[in-house]
Amino acid sequence: MSQITSKGRRILDKKIRTFPVGFTSRKVAGHVLNISPYFLLAFSYAENKGQSAFEEIKGSNVIDMSCVICFNFSCHLFVVIFISRSTETIPTTKLLLSKYIFYCVNALELTLFLSYKSYS
């Protein structure tokens, strides 16, 4: 999936409007979106954390998987998962943690994650 679907874009636009002011325009998967700086901070954190971020998702107290959106960054497929959580375990901006945490995992990990959720 190299582009955000129109439905995915509408969901993303709706989600980022719930964040604080300070949006900046960024080109994401060929689309210019007004993205919260907290989105970029969390995305960077998830990319750097890699596999351990996925393990943390599996072991966390997940309340709700609000939506899943696919992007293609540098010819690698990543998936951003918007997860609402009851605990603040990641040492980063509290404002972000109080609303949503974003994780970036590859497509295989997403399949495993969805399978894991369906059996839990």
Swiss-Prot record:
GO CC annotations, alphabetized: membrane
Cellular location(s): Membrane
Chief site of localization: membrane
Topology within the bilayer: Single-pass membrane protein
Transmembrane feature ranges: 63-83
Keyword list, A-Z: Membrane, Transmembrane, Transmembrane helix
Keyword presence, Transmembrane helix: yes
Protein name stated in the entry: Uncharacterized protein YGR045C
Native source species: Saccharomyces cerevisiae (strain ATCC 204508 / S288c)
